Amino acid sequence: MARYTKAKCRLCRREGEKLFIKGDRCFTDKCSYERRPYAPGIAGRMRKKMSDYAIQLREKQKVRRMYGVLEGQFRSYFKRADGMKGVTGANLLMLLETRLDNTVYRLGFANSRAQARQLVKHGIFTKNGRRVNVPSMHVKPGDVIEVREESRKIPVIAEAQEVIARRGCPEWLEADGANFKGEVKAMPTREDIQFPINEQLIVELYSK
């Protein structure tokens, strides 16, 4: 499956804001976007006025890259969100938030979504007692995500309590770093997603 393999900080610079792709590094002065807050390339400093379509496209790319989802997957999520009851944009964000890799990241067991995806693929987590290794798997209220006993000495996992204390945990999740597990308490709401996203632009883009 194709994945973006170049410097991830370039993606933040391309979108003109932090996407927090590299986890804790994004909160330090080592963040590339902090040092060079303009698009990569020779003409990066000269941002042109964008058309409505370009603005919609950039918003879609921003969200897709933030969650580390491929274009085909993202379009599939939109179609699914559009067929659900409620507001399509909010439904889309809920589907992205309840991916297993994002849940692992939100619980503090990884420094970034990319790292969470890798850890899930290595099969170090269980969901309701069963080993899982599919990052795109969705979680629901009542699900318990736990680190397998033999994987608890992995440095990033061992530091989970510290990460949770520093970063916090969204209200729809309950993290128990001391016991290397977390529980899904409810489905995430739009208010649970603090990152500045204008999902209506994405809806308008796919509605053309």
Swiss-Prot record:
InterPro entries: Ribosomal_uS4, Ribosomal_uS4_bac-type, Ribosomal_uS4_CS, Ribosomal_uS4_N, S4_RNA-bd, S4_RNA-bd_sf. Keywords: Ribonucleoprotein, Ribosomal protein, RNA-binding, rRNA-binding. GO terms for cellular component: small ribosomal subunit. SUPFAM superfamilies: Alpha-L RNA-binding motif. It comes from the Bacteria. GO terms for biological process: ribosomal small subunit biogenesis; translation. Residues 98-161 form the S4 RNA-binding domain. One of the primary rRNA binding proteins, it binds directly to 16S rRNA where it nucleates assembly of the body of the 30S subunit. With S5 and S12 plays an important role in translational accuracy. Part of the 30S ribosomal subunit. Contacts protein S5. The interaction surface between S4 and S5 is involved in control of translational fidelity. Belongs to the universal ribosomal protein uS4 family. NCBIfam families: PRK05327.1, rpsD_bact. This is Small ribosomal subunit protein uS4. It comes from Maridesulfovibrio salexigens (strain ATCC 14822 / DSM 2638 / NCIMB 8403 / VKM B-1763). The lineage of its organism: Bacteria, Pseudomonadati, Thermodesulfobacteriota, Desulfovibrionia, Desulfovibrionales.
